Swiss-Prot record:
Gene3D superfamilies: 2-C-methyl-D-erythritol 2,4-cyclodiphosphate synthase. Keywords: Isoprene biosynthesis, Lyase, Metal-binding. NCBIfam families: ispF. Pathway: Isoprenoid biosynthesis; isopentenyl diphosphate biosynthesis via DXP pathway; isopentenyl diphosphate from 1-deoxy-D-xylulose 5-phosphate: step 4/6. The keyword Nuclease does not apply. Its cofactor is a divalent metal cation. A divalent metal cation binds at D12, H14, H46. The record marks H38, T137 as: Transition state stabilizer. PROSITE patterns: ISPF (PS01350). This is 2-C-methyl-D-erythritol 2,4-cyclodiphosphate synthase. It catalyses: 4-CDP-2-C-methyl-D-erythritol 2-phosphate = 2-C-methyl-D-erythritol 2,4-cyclic diphosphate + CMP. The keyword rRNA processing does not apply. Binds 1 divalent metal cation per subunit.
Length: 166
């Protein structure tokens, strides 16, 4: 049986470290810390990539962009998202919508949410209203609550655009 829709979910987390900004959804956000990561550490785009890959059972971001590979040192996570989108399109799928939640006490995400939505929609060539970015705190519980790091969750709905050749 073949369906014309698939769903996927992703999660990413990074600890805070030295720096003066974090990348969130492809947007540079000023912050008192950076993140400890091999690439630019964009938890939003990393979670979104994992959701997209998971929807088609294509593995995870670590398999496609291993931290052991020097090519990805300090890489712009927009590259990762475009690669994942290309894999979907090659197989006849597109992102129908994406729903992303950032979990942190700081930085405040709200003032940057529209810019993140615009960046993600542009990278995926989808409508702005197909991308949701929102934030929550963990009520000062756990590592995000103590301000030690940042996390993101993403859910996607994929739609079939073409039946791949057999």
């Amino acid at each position: 049986m073949s369906f014309n829709f698939r769903i996927g979910q992703g999660y990413d987390v990074h600890a805070f470290g030295p720096g003066d900004h974090v990348m969130l959804g492809g947007v540079r956000v000023a912050h008192s810390h950076g993140v400890l990561a091999h690439s630019d550490g964009d938890v939003v785009l990393h979670a979104l990539c994992d959701a997209m890959l998971g929807a088609l059972a294509l593995g995870d971001i670590g398999q496609h962009f291993p931290p052991s590979d020097a090519r990805w040192k300090d890489a712009d996570s927009a590259q990762f998202l475009q690669h994942c989108d290309g894999l979907l399109r090659e197989r006849g799928w597109r992102v129908g919508n994406a729903d992303i939640t950032v979990i942190c006490e700081r930085p405040k995400v709200g003032p940057h949410a529209v810019a993140m939505r615009e960046r993600i929609a542009g990278l995926l060539a989808i409508e702005l209203d197909a991308v949701s970015v929102k934030a929550t705190t963990s009520e000062q519980l756990g590592f995000t609550g103590r301000g030690e790091g940042i996390a993101a969750q993403a859910a996607v709905l994929l739609g079939r655009t073409a039946v791949p050749h057999q």
